[in-house]
Regions:
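Hydrophobic core of transmembrane alpha-helices in multi-pass small-molecule transporters
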Residues: 19, 85, 96-112, 311-326
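Juxtamembrane intracellular "pre-TM" segments in multi-pass secondary transporters
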Residues: 1-8, 186-229
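C-terminal transmembrane bundle of multi-pass solute transporters/carriers
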Residues: 48, 72, 163, 244-401
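Cytoplasmic helix-loop-helix junction between adjacent transmembrane helices
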Residues: 103-145
């Protein structure tokens, strides 16, 4: 393929998009904002359920769209959806609009999830420097995490911004991110990608069917890809749940809304530190790396569930940091194992596997907590399960990669 790419400009656009998309200033306070407007906990829970359902059903189709129609188009479309959902949330007055906006948010996130990774890896592959993926990916992750940590501090502006102000500022940041994606170049590494614009619309259904067949063939003939997908889905389950239940515990302990940014800020800094460790770790065996990371994630989850407030915050930080180490190397190995024409689709399968585990895990953790009368009981059980998954691999022969 004779296509040249300006990697310096490409990275600048990616990093700019990472920064402004990372400034999600509503993440730390969206539950509190809705509750303050009179929405009940079951209504807020319903909106969260809509988010996960849309994520589940749109994860793989969005990846397929990225592979067939182009990664740049998909990222820009996701940015538009993100702006629209913020505007809807800013002026929503009923549960239906809130749920619709949450669905748009989920759709946007599915468009970003596998597509961003695929575009970055193939940009490097086009220039023959895939070995730089971990370093470049780590840079983008750290920029996004630092932005997320800064954005979480917006909760201290609760009295000045108000409900609508949070989401209008969110929409502005999302718009800048979408503009940065608009300046990206579409990487071309295969003949199929080079001929995307030549395919008529009526050929799309057959292309989708062929993409499904090709993706299933890759999963069947490459067991390593399936193992990596399953491992990342399992070890990632505590990521959101530890943050969610920690926020709930801190509110119950009397923490004001203005201070809820603190655990998210510290969690973001832990992610940055974890990414820095991850880029310096030389992974000789994914099996050993998973075992070590699963044991540490399990310990962190146990701390969130059983320790006092600051012990819980430290546990959440441990979970977030360790996950970044594992997922950075898992992403590299998965990209190395799969072909470019199915890259976004198969990375989206990775995300779908996580959603499939989260749908039962979230209510189960809550139900265990209710049954024992202790909010942390469910997290303690989850932490034990994650630790057992790591122990189960310790006795097996490491697989070198």
């Amino acid at each position: 393929m004779d296509h040249k790419l300006n990697l310096k400009k490409q990275f600048a656009c990616i990093y700019t998009s990472d920064f402004f998309s990372g400034l999600r200033i509503t993440d730390a306070v969206w539950v509190a904002l809705l509750a303050a407007r009179g929405f009940s906990l079951w209504e807020i829970g319903l909106a969260e359920s809509v988010y996960h359902i849309v994520s589940l059903f749109c994860e793989v189709p969005s990846g397929m769209a990225a592979d067939l129609l182009g990664r740049k188009k998909t990222l820009v479309s996701g940015g538009v959806c993100m702006v629209l959902q913020s505007l809807l949330m800013a002026f929503a007055s009923d549960l239906f609009t809130i749920c619709f906006a949450m669905g748009l948010n989920a759709l946007a996130m599915t468009m970003f999830s596998g597509t961003t990774t695929a575009l970055l890896y193939d940009s490097l592959k086009q220039e023959g420097c895939e070995e730089k993926y971990i370093q470049v990916s780590a840079n983008g992750s750290q920029i996004s995490m630092l932005a997320n940590a800064v954005g979480s501090m917006a909760s201290i502006l609760n009295q000045f911004l108000g409900y609508a102000g949070f989401y209008l500022l969110n929409a502005a940041f999302g718009g800048i991110s979408a503009l940065a994606n608009l300046l990206l170049a579409e990487p071309i590494v295969t003949e199929s990608q080079a001929s995307r614009e030549k395919h008529p619309l009526h050929a799309l259904p057959e292309q989708f069917r062929q993409l499904v067949r090709d993706s299933l063939h890759v999963l069947h003939t490459c067991p390593m890809a399936g193992k990596l997908i399953a491992s990342s889905a399992l070890i990632s389950v505590p990521s959101y749940l530890t943050k969610m239940f920690l926020q709930q515990r801190l509110v119950e302990l009397g923490w004001p809304t203005e201070l809820l940014f603190l655990p998210l800020l510290l969690g973001g800094l832990a992610c940055v530190a974890g990414t820095e460790v991850g880029r310096r770790v030389r992974c000789r065996s994914m099996r050993r790396l998973y075992s070590a990371c699963a044991l540490l994630c399990g310990v962190g989850t146990l701390l969130v569930g059983a320790a006092p407030a600051w012990g819980g915050i430290l546990g959440m930080m441990l979970v977030q940091g360790v996950l970044e180490v594992y997922l950075l190397h898992e992403s590299q190995k998965l990209n190395d194992a799969i072909p470019s024409d199915q890259r976004a689709t198969l990375i989206s399968v990775d995300g779908m596997a996580y959603s499939l585990l989260m749908i039962p895990a979230s209510p189960l953790v809550g139900a265990v907590g209710d049954a024992f009368g202790q909010a942390g009981a469910g997290l303690a059980l989850l932490g034990g399960a994650i630790m057992l998954s790591g122990v189960a691999l310790l006795g097996k022969k490491p697989q070198r990669s």
